[in-house]
Design a protein with these regions (language model features):
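Arg/Lys-rich RNA-binding interfaces used to dock onto structured RNA substrates
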Residues: 1-126, 149, 193
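RNA substrate-binding interface of SAM-dependent RNA methyltransferases
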Residues: 101-203
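Structured adenosyl-cofactor binding patch, chiefly the S-adenosyl-L-methionine
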Residues: 97, 137-139, 153, 160-166, ...
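Active-site/ligand-binding-proximal alpha/beta "capping" segment
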Residues: 197-246
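Short, hinge-like loop/turn segments at secondary-structure boundaries
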Residues: 69-70, 95, 161-165, 190, ...
Length: 270
């Protein structure tokens, strides 16, 4: 039997905090997902759906009815249209999902001979995190790691920007570079020669001339400050992206996309 929310009561306020308060979101271990494709991807990839919030005053689409029917033991919450729209930050919405977070454990990322991973160091914009995740998924990466004091990958803007890719690959936060560098060294010691690759306008080599078919961990610097000294020191090579025109650099997410595409191109041609 579905519960109901028709007032801005304590439960509604708790749901709001999952959207607006990073600390409370992580304490609860939950985040809100909206949209047909993101919710479908979360279900298909086995994410734990903890509650389904839906418009209790309209006839739901077949898709929404199917999602509800597929989760009979998940909490179903009927909401008034105005409150549901407030959570979704849009007027027309029929279904939202409350999803359990997955642990920030680097071992969730599988690293084999064709490994391609991304580190996004201290990103400040949730939308850029989402864009990097989307590109990483599109071009065959095995995971994305955010490091340092950064925007939250579970921020609704970040999740929305991935258009569902967030649920298809591991996305892990590491407080500092040290844990990631240790993770790389462990895999090197086990025989996997991961190459740590940074990019810069004054790089050591053009990216198209470098072998990106080997196991690669791509470093993407903060939008404002680039990579920290720790990451610059950890990089085995710094590549440049060939550009014309007056632009001296690319947006962090765009730069990551270009290198990920080049890695995919080389691997397909191999």
């Amino acid at each position: 039997m579905a519960t109901r929310i028709s007032l801005r009561n304590a439960r509604f306020q708790q749901l709001q905090t999952l959207l607006t308060n990073r600390n409370k979101r992580h304490r609860a271990g939950q985040f809100i997902v909206q949209g047909v494709r993101p919710i479908t991807m979360a279900v298909e990839h086995g994410w734990e759906i903890q509650a389904l919030l839906y418009d209790g005053e309209r006839r739901l689409s077949q898709w929404a009815r199917d999602v509800l029917a597929a989760h009979p033991h998940t909490e179903h919450v009927k909401m008034s249209p105005d409150l549901l729209a407030e959570l979704a930050e849009k007027d027309e919405v029929e279904l939202l999902a409350v999803v359990a977070m997955r642990p920030d454990v680097l071992d969730r990322i599988e690293a084999g001979p064709d490994f391609l991973g991304v580190v996004f160091d201290r990103p400040t914009q949730p939308g850029n995190i989402g864009a990097v995740i989307r590109s990483a998924d599109a071009f065959g990466a095995h995971g994305v790691i955010t490091t340092g004091h950064s925007a939250d990958a579970y921020d609704p803007k970040a999740v929305r920007a991935t258009t569902g890719s967030f649920f298809a690959m591991p996305v892990v936060r590491s407080p500092s570079p040290a844990a990631v560098i240790s993770w790389v060294e462990e895999r090197r010691a086990a025989g996997l020669p991961i190459v740590v690759v940074a990019t810069d306008e004054h790089g050591d080599a053009d990216m198209s001339a470098f072998d990106l078919t080997q196991p690669v961990l791509l470093l993407v610097g903060s939008e404002n400050d680039g990579l920290t000294r720790a990451w610059r020191d950890a990089a085995d090579v710094t590549l440049s992206i060939p550009m014309t025109g007056s632009a001296s650099s690319l947006n962090a997410a765009n730069a990551a996309t270009v290198v990920l595409y080049e890695a995919r191109r080389q691997r397909l041609a191999k």
